[in-house]
């Protein structure tokens, strides 16, 4: 486990550095263009590193189903009716052993271009995370790049059985796939599947709907879902063995971590088996679980051997509600307590490819209003924090790109470019020349905050002390709209205060004597609270009354270093 605080930059290479700005709804790669591995130049990567990031999660690296025709390069043509969007979903994998040809300057050199990206990322002082999608594959999965000693998924399946411990897929016996509920031109439907396979979201019917993950099929890990969830893990299921080979393949490419898509839809026993086997050969490699079931958290850490878990249904949901005014900020204490013993294993974020942008009309409508939430999420513990590319510039996600409608999210299904990223790119200069003052301001905030997360040892490795209980009855605090806590270690003590109110506030924060004892700090008569983010606040003097009077902007916050004269 890293001694530094892990700070992840999630980026969809298809969008990053895209040189075309046509942005035609449902446009092709010819019309709208695509980002490339090579667009992550040393200059671009050094700028990402300067913002404080330790890891880059390159989203959508592994080859996935797409409507773009690469048959001239020996890549099988896909069926449009089983693909979401023109570019396709990065989570409908068509070949686990290949990379997305959209991302290559020269398609025939696509793997080498990815390997060079890994090398460049490492040379710029950052680690590489990619997706591992274990639960499902594209309906028309066909690997052309697999090693010769690896058999194809489903090649040895007995398709007359809806379930068999030795099968890679689940089947709907004697039924043909029926796409009539999917919104496509059914006169042009050419894809056929008999017997039909179960769809990726545990849909065991031959007739998936438009609300199902109809572009994917579920993989069989030895669980008979339609027979009381009976498990068949001995002998080791063939799917397990295939997946171990895939993980080793990418680990050998010097990838430093895997973000495991929908990890809880795969049996815990598989993770318990495979992660230690991978870590035996690659002990520093990270495994991050996309997981939404709080009751499973500890098992996925203690048995499943994951390093980190998504904190979506905990901190993200609560902080979002607080920022939007739907619940009091005091609720943050309760959600932190729920994962108190494992909080250092939770991955915090305010945006990712699944969630709505802070600046969208569906969230806060203004990136500045996300500052309080970001300070809290980044500084509340030693655990990782993640930022989604464009978040640091105030990307709104309010385009109607094609398959992805105007929903406050940046598309993962369509060819597109992001104006703010394109202007930061500035023809490969990766500077602020073309950014607006507002974009520069929010970017500078993220840069300052994320760098502080590792510059200040109290944030990087220190302990946490919640100040809310000491301020519930404080009439000058307002525990429904403010949140305050301490972070400290043997070197320093930090006071962090955030304001979720829509107005600037003068806040009186009580720090009890017990807090100083908790951090083994000697409290003296005269103290100073020096702002590190410097949002208008001068250094504040305080005495042994335990109270600090602080001025906090609307939807903002500050980190104060506490010292004594």
Describe every region a protein language model picked out.
Residues 1-127, 135-137, 142-146, 150-160, ...:
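N-terminal structural segment of carbohydrate-active enzymes
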Residues 2-8, 12, 92-93, 98-119, ...:
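Alpha-amylase-like alpha-glycosidases and glucanotransferases acting on alpha-linked glucans and related
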Residues 3, 19, 66, 81-82, ...:
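Loop/helix patches that line or flank the sugar-binding groove of alpha-linked glycan CAZymes
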Residues 13-15, 62, 100-103, 134-136, ...:
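Short, flexible loop/turn elements at secondary-structure junctions
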Residues 17-20, 64-70, 136-143, 266-270, ...:
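Short catalytic/ligand-binding loop motif for oxyanion handling, primarily in non-cytosolic enzymes
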Residues 39, 43, 113-116, 242-245, ...:
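Extracytoplasmic/secreted proteins, especially bacterial periplasmic and envelope-associated proteins
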Residues 55-60, 128-132, 259-260, 387-390:
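Short beta-strand segments at enzyme active-site cores
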Residues 501-565:
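C-terminal beta-sandwich/jelly-roll accessory domains of carbohydrate-active enzymes
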